[in-house]
Amino acid sequence: MTITRTLLHLLERHLSLSALTAGEAGPLVVFCHGFPGLAFSWRHQLTALAAAGYRAVAFDMKGYGQSDRPLDLEAYQARVVSDDLAAVLDALGAERAVFVGHDFGAKAAFCMALHHPERVAGVVSLAVPYGVQFAGARDDGAAKGPADATPQGDAKPPADAIKRTEDGVVLSARK
């Protein structure tokens, strides 16, 4: 599978994000890297998912790699970043996606689910601590962890949404 680098121009947000894409069609999976990662960190996952029939996109988060680096610190607040992710979907012509986040990229994915639940088909988080780093994810500052960053505030998915693969990987999806 081929990976293509492109620049996503989020015109209404006055922001450009460097992205790697693989796969032309299929359900969309968006990867959000952590510190000190880049879109390149997801190259193996992009090709594997594209080969499995998914459209996979990873981008350099705002302030990283070849993406824009706004000087205004408010541009990096959780709500602003979740709005950026919604604009990424718009730029890709997609209504919904599964978001995969590593480290602080998981916070972005959780906040996307909180603020734009209709655009999120699922969230996968990797290597992210539970706790105070999520404080302030909600506008009222009440979010304290991943459970608070889900639309229903319930960290426990329904039993029919969980599947364990033969190699022990646990998959979860929201309908």
List the predicted regions and their residue ranges.
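Flexible "cap/lid" subdomain of the alpha/beta-hydrolase fold that forms the substrate-access gate
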Residues: M1-L7, S16-L17, W42, V57, ...
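Short gly/ser/thr-rich secondary-structure transition/capping motifs
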Residues: L10-R13, G37
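A short loop-to-beta-strand scaffold at the N-terminal edge of the catalytic core in hydrolase folds
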Residues: E12-T21
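Residue-level marker of motif borders
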Residues: R13, L28-V29, V98
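Conserved HGGG/HGGXW glycine-rich cap/lid loop of the alpha/beta-hydrolase fold
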Residues: L20-D68, V88
